[in-house]
Regions:
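Short acidic/glycine- and proline-prone juxtamembrane loop motifs at membrane-interface regions
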Residues: 129-137
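Membrane-interface alpha helices of multi-pass inner-membrane proteins
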Residues: 121, 159-177, 181-186, 297-308
Length: 525
């Protein structure tokens, strides 16, 4: 009878977790937008459905997996903003439920599993709400580490088979932090396999890796994605930026030590228990607990380094509930006095930190630069188009006058709807193609003048992007280019001489450039 009640309780708790993790992300994703980030995969997914090819029809440095998966969601569920954010909500739900079952498998009290999972749902994808490559890749890396520790714990081959696939998908989402986590996981596996003589594991890992690579190569062939474009845009160009940023890292700086102090505090009990276990074990230092500890240590290092390199708002605080939970597991499994008090402290600490970051990143939407916005001023985005219905429109661009921004956008949509020539639009309002049901041939997902999205001057791949842009304009027979504020005309003129364009009159804060005969282009326009 008791066992049946526990099973019933577990099902109820899982149902609550499922609903909560979906709803909280869906709710906060509708709470204002930062156009450059909030719509990053919106138009791109629409363009893929309509035949555009990544690396060929738009410059791509990250997000390949998200783009195709979102295209699938649009194809199956419809093309609107609520379907778009449901994708992120589903990932939040998947990782939250997985966290619950991982903790339960490590024999943590079911109600603590429930509590820590809810905290995870609050700090997971919800801090962005909308699809974002750093969240997506980091959460997939966490899922890979879950597979690793379950393989170590259970010795089941299914986790070894899943591990390369998940890491591969994380890499196809964003090369960093997945590369850091890949090397971390590889180090742990090599140590474990050779120390424990689990050489059969190599077979499963190699077969799974080869199968995944073959599948991706076949998919690239099917999707007409050229490998040379993939290597240049997805690997070589981002690494040219990442090398410089890693070289500038100071591991003793305040950014690394103090900004992530709550992550370190949640990890300290796990560290101390592991040290005590190593001292006590003496000859059996490399037990499973040591490898669990090493897995989380290297994951923390990987994500902290990645977080600092991105130079974005913080997004890795979802580690805190996971680390608090595993610290509690380690404490319960070790002979320590007052272990219940330590467990209560971890629960209260996690509650405090989750509340703190929930208010800062979810309520204030700090990740998307909206911490100073009055959300009471927001307006239903269906005033722009019914496909954006449900989104409470307010942005950092027009923080005090969303109605004025909506009027501006409706004017732009009207102009683009009546444009009969082949047009290219350079804008961070990356929903215009889907809204007007017309490919606007944007050469990049987003426009950032710092050189992170595409090469700028002094980057060795500058000429490659220049040639890509000119080829795109020529191949698509573009006759007119619209540049919408806050994107600057320099995002075009740094690659193509302004003598190739004639400015035409249009609405305020929009540049309309007619393409003239020009030596830059292979054909007269």
């Amino acid at each position: 009878m008791l066992k049946k009640n526990l099973q019933l309780n577990e099902k109820i708790l899982v149902l609550i977790i499922l609903v909560f993790s979906l709803i909280i992300n869906q709710y906060y994703a509708n709470r204002g937008v930062f156009p450059i980030e909030s719509f990053a995969h919106f138009d791109i997914a629409f363009r893929i459905i309509n035949g555009d090819i990544p690396f060929q029809d738009y410059w791509l440095v990250s997000g390949l997996f998200i783009d195709y998966l979102q295209a699938f969601f649009f194809k199956v569920l419809g093309q609107n903003f609520q379907v778009y954010i449901f994708h992120a909500s589903l990932i939040n739900c998947l990782l939250t439920i997985t966290t619950f079952y991982i903790l339960k498998n490590f024999n943590l009290n079911i109600y603590q599993c429930f509590f820590y999972s809810l905290c995870f749902a609050i700090l997971g994808y919800t801090t962005s709400g909308t699809l974002y490559v750093d969240h997506h890749s980091s959460l997939l890396c966490l899922l890979a580490v879950y597979c690793l520790i379950m393989a170590l714990k259970t010795d089941k081959k299914k986790f070894l088979i899943l591990l390369p696939v998940i890491l591969g998908l994380a890499f196809l989402t964003k090369s960093a932090p997945s590369v850091y986590v890949f090397f971390s996981v590889s180090l742990i596996l090599i140590l474990y396999i050779f120390i424990k003589k689990k050489f059969i594991w190599l077979l499963y890992l190699i077969l799974s890796s080869l199968s995944f690579i073959i599948f991706i190569l076949l998919f690239f062939d099917f999707a007409n994605i050229k490998l040379e474009n993939f290597f240049e845009q997805y690997l070589l160009f981002p690494s040219s930026i990442g090398k410089n940023r890693i070289a500038e890292l100071n591991f003793l700086s305040g950014d690394i030590i103090f900004d992530y102090k709550f992550i370190y505090i949640s990890f300290i009990p796990l560290l101390l228990v592991t040290l005590l276990d190593v001292i006590k074990s003496k000859k059996n230092i490399f037990n499973k607990n040591f490898f669990f500890f090493l897995s989380f240590l290297l994951l923390i290092l990987s994500l902290v380094i990645h977080q600092i390199n991105t130079r974005n708002q913080e997004f890795i605080f979802f580690l805190i509930p996971v680390l608090c939970a595993f610290s509690s597991i380690f404490i319960y499994n070790y002979e320590i006095k007052y272990k219940k008090y330590f467990s209560v402290f971890l629960l209260l600490f996690c509650l405090f930190v989750t509340s703190k970051y929930h208010l800062r990143f979810n309520d204030e939407r700090r990740f998307h630069e909206m911490s100073k916005i009055n959300f009471d001023l927001s307006v239903d985005a269906k005033k722009i188009d019914k496909k954006l219905s449900g989104l409470n429109w307010i942005t950092p661009i027009f923080p005090n006058s969303p109605e004025e921004e909506i009027k501006f956008l409706r004017e732009i949509i009207g102009v683009l709807n009546t444009e009969n020539n082949k047009a290219m639009v350079m804008s961070n309002y990356s929903f215009l193609s889907l809204v007007i049901d017309k490919n606007l041939h944007s050469p990049s997902r987003w426009y950032i003048p710092n050189g992170a999205a595409y090469p700028i001057e002094n980057n060795k791949y500058f000429d490659e992007y220049k040639n890509f842009l000119i080829d795109l304009i020529t191949r698509k027979k573009i006759s007119v280019i619209y540049i919408i504020s806050p994107v600057k005309v320099d995002e075009l003129y740094r690659y193509v001489s302004k003598d190739c364009f004639e400015e035409d009159k249009t609405i305020a804060d929009v540049k309309k450039l007619l393409i003239k005969d020009c030596s830059y282009f292979k054909r007269p326009i």
